[in-house]
Amino acid sequence: MAEPWSGQSLQALPATVLGALGALGSEFLREWEAQDMRVTLFKLLLFWLVLSLLSIQLAWGFYGSTVTGLYHRPGLGGQNGSTPDGSTHFPSWETAANEPLKTHRE
């Protein structure tokens, strides 16, 4: 029969995870101070990400209302500029309803 989990192993789990994260962080700091090429690449990619996010935020500030206006058009239609209620009336279809359906042979 399998042994149940002991309370000590569950209590040691957060300490183990924090220890591993601490070791990873200290290794990263050593490489950061040594100006390793990977760290330089990381800095460059982090700068690119921050610059891209700031550019998106700035563009949304200028053009956000225009983009929102494309999706929410005023008019007779429902939400998001759907087909107006009055346009579903097709008189040519009503006159054709009295005629029998045509088959592909006719």
Swiss-Prot record:
The modification N-acetylalanine is found at residue 2. It is found in: Membrane. The chain crosses the membrane at residues 9-29, 44-64. Pfam families: T_cell_tran_alt. It is a multi-pass membrane protein. One of its GO terms (cellular component) is membrane. Signal peptide: none annotated. Keywords: Acetylation, Membrane, Transmembrane, Transmembrane helix. GO terms for biological process: osteoclast fusion. Residues 81-90 have a biased composition (Polar residues). Residues 2-8, 65-106 are extracellular. Residues 74-106 are annotated as: Disordered. Its main location: membrane. Residues 30-43 are cytoplasmic. Belongs to the TCTA family. May be required for cellular fusion during osteoclastogenesis. This is T-cell leukemia translocation-altered gene protein homolog. It comes from Bos taurus (Bovine). The lineage of its organism: Eukaryota, Metazoa, Chordata, Craniata, Vertebrata.
